[in-house]
Amino acid sequence: MKSKYILVTGGLGYIGSHTTIALIDKGYKVCIIDNLSNSSIDVLKRIKQITNISPDFFEFDLTDASKAKTFFKKNNQFDGVIHFAAKKSVDESVRKPLDYYYNNIQSLINLPDNINTDVKFIFSSSCTVYGQAEKLPITETTPLKKPESPYGNTKKICENILEDKTKIETKLSTVILRYFNPIGAHPSGLIGEDPRNVPQNLVPIITQFAIGKLKKFAVFGDDYPTRDGTCIRDYIPIMDLADAHISALEYLFSNKKNNIYNVFNVGTGEGKSVKEVIDSFNKVSGKNLQYDVRPRRKGDVISAFADISKAKKILNWTSKVSFEDAVLSAWNWEQNK
């Protein structure tokens, strides 16, 4: 049987690279598009080192409509598309909103505008579309408030675009995966979260501070109405998140019905505070990190964690890696880089 061919945009990034490995392990053929703005070509070599297979790779920016059109004229035989390519910092999006609106929305528009309509489409969305939810845990039917950041708003707009596009394309099927907070690294220690610039996410900030790459480490706000005063998030191990994409693809490929549009939360169902993450890192690493406390950061919600019962029921997916193991894998990756 011929392997299904999956296009992974942003496939050398953090989530994209782990998902690429999961796809290859499941027997899919993979093609990656990445502009290397927040990733490295070295990841491609490491994917081959882990899987013994080198996926097809094309370097260009999906916001370039002309290049996208040229690419898809020559390469339009994909069975599925997983779209990761996007800017992803909440804090940076508050400072550079137009960069985020242009990059994240334009790169999406240039995909369904060019690909075959008979395709299974997985979109990398975010729990930021919920804003500050009034009730926890967050379900897929939780009302979407105005997101707290331009980043979150771009994800919300992209969801709307895909929903509208799916309505008019009778053969297009779409799954939206609303991630909570990915953490951890591949068990090989060969790939993990490795931002080109100063990290924006909590765990790589912690690991880079612990190893000496960062000289300062700050917690933004310890006066939130939470159990210890710091923000609470649902931290999803990266290997579980990668598997969620496989489950979503298999759900679409096995479904006899065309023109599906469905949304799933991808988290663990449990929230951890910033202080609890630091404590867990200290426990698995043997460190005793000291940090500064600074004022609250604009764009941060107080608390967010998922209800994942829908993904369990329909996708037959659930998180399996423990929080401590995910934190330890991130630390092992930091030391192996």
Predicted regions and their residues:
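C-terminal substrate-binding subdomain of Rossmann-fold SDR/epimerase-dehydratase oxidoreductases
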Residues: 205, 211-337
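Flexible, glycine-rich beta-alpha linker
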Residues: 130-131, 149-150, 172-199, 226-227
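Short-chain dehydrogenase/reductase
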Residues: 101, 148-156, 192-200, 204, ...
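NAD(P)-cofactor binding segment of oxidoreductase domains
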Residues: 95-122, 160
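Conserved Rossmann-fold NAD(P)-dependent oxidoreductase catalytic core, especially the SDR/UDP-sugar
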Residues: 83, 109-150, 168, 175
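Active-site Tyr-X1-5-Lys
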Residues: 148-183, 204-212
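N-terminal Rossmann/SDR dinucleotide-binding element
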Residues: 2-80, 198
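Short alpha-helical oligomerization interface
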Residues: 90-106, 139-147
